[in-house]
Amino acid sequence: MQINLPLPTIILILYIIYVIFSIIMNKIKFNAENLEELDGEFIFTFISKIKKQQIYFNINEVKLCILTRIFIRQGTFKTINFNILLNDGYSLRLKKKRDCLLFLKVCREKKTELYQKILSMIPADMTVISILEKELDNFKG
């Protein structure tokens, strides 16, 4: 039994397989990201392509932290994302709410000037800052 498919059909099937594979890999990458903290020292674990990698850094090595996305619904954050630039040239992207809140909590406790700089980047009124403070107070990392 031999199946003869036209070339456009074969290309379409391969494209669908590729799209499904890339969606699955993105979900695996997102679920594998993790930020751990101990006394101002961080370990950020992520998957780059297929290999698992870790970046170790201290809160004092953070050069710049940019708030890239924030969505608030019903008085709480649904989405909050950060890009963190380190002194040695590395950059990290925190996409999970838990990781972002952990980073902000350590900034508030250990490096207040960075925390104030992050708060000044929030393009909104005091309501957003009060929601952020409430979330940080309730956060148990």
Q: Which residues are covered by each model-predicted region?
A:
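Short acidic, Gly/Pro-enriched loop/turn segments at secondary-structure junctions
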Residues: L67-T79
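Surface loops and adjacent helix of pleckstrin homology
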Residues: I47-S48, L67-I70, K95-K97
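Conserved beta-hairpin
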Residues: F21-F57, L64
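Alpha-helical transmembrane spans
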Residues: M1-A32
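Canonical pleckstrin homology
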Residues: F77-S91
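Short, mixed charged/polar active-site loops
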Residues: K51-Q54, G89-R93
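Short, aromatic- and cysteine-enriched interfacial helices/patches
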Residues: I3-L5, F44-K51, T76, L101, ...
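Terminal and domain-flanking low-complexity segments
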Residues: Y90-G141
